[in-house]
UniProtKB/Swiss-Prot annotation:
SUPFAM superfamilies: Alpha-L RNA-binding motif (SSF55174). GO terms for biological process: cellular response to heat; response to heat. Residues 9-71 form the S4 RNA-binding domain. This is Heat shock protein 15. InterPro entries: HSP15 (IPR025708), S4_RNA-bd (IPR002942), S4_RNA-bd_sf (IPR036986). Induction: By heat shock. Belongs to the HSP15 family. Monomer. One of its GO terms (cellular component) is cytosol. Keywords: DNA-binding, RNA-binding, Stress response. One of its GO terms (molecular function) is DNA binding. The gene is hslR. The keyword RNA-binding applies.
Length: 133
């Protein structure tokens, strides 16, 4: 017979306790929106979290893969919350590469020294939308 864990915690509550999201409502929204995968599959917020489960989280441009190491439903300080999971080495490496690529991409984009004045702004609009005169 299967032994029940001491604490059963919903996925949305665990993500909130592990400090991936500020509110449970936001965690629930991300799960329902397909941004969180539990063991490689889409899940529901009410899914019970198990030890050593693999979670894939998409947050903005970042995607991280974590393994559940501990289960709690209480939100603790960030230093303690980091002990609830372990990010995989591939995930860390991939996030660092993506951050570097974003940083390098930002360097190639032109940033003007000042805002365009009235004449320059009109010239930009004419260029973007074509000369309507």
């Amino acid at each position: 017979m299967k032994e029940k864990p001491a604490v059963e915690v919903r996925l949305d509550k665990w993500l909130w306790a592990a400090r991936f999201y500020k509110t449970r409502a936001l965690a629930r929204e991300m799960i329902e929106g397909g941004k969180v995968h539990y063991n490689g599959q889409r899940s529901k917020p009410s899914k019970i979290v198990e030890l050593n489960a693999t979670l894939t989280l998409r947050q903005g441009n970042d995607e991280r893969t974590v393994i559940v190491k501990a289960i709690t439903e209480q939100r603790r300080p960030a230093s303690e919350a980091a002990l609830l999971y372990e990010e995989t080495a591939e995930s860390v490496e991939k996030r660092e590469k993506m951050a570097l690529a974003r940083k390098l991409n930002a360097l190639t984009m032109p940033h003007p020294d000042r805002r365009p004045d009235k004449k320059e702004r009109r010239d930009l609009l004419r260029f973007k939308h074509g000369d309507s005169e």
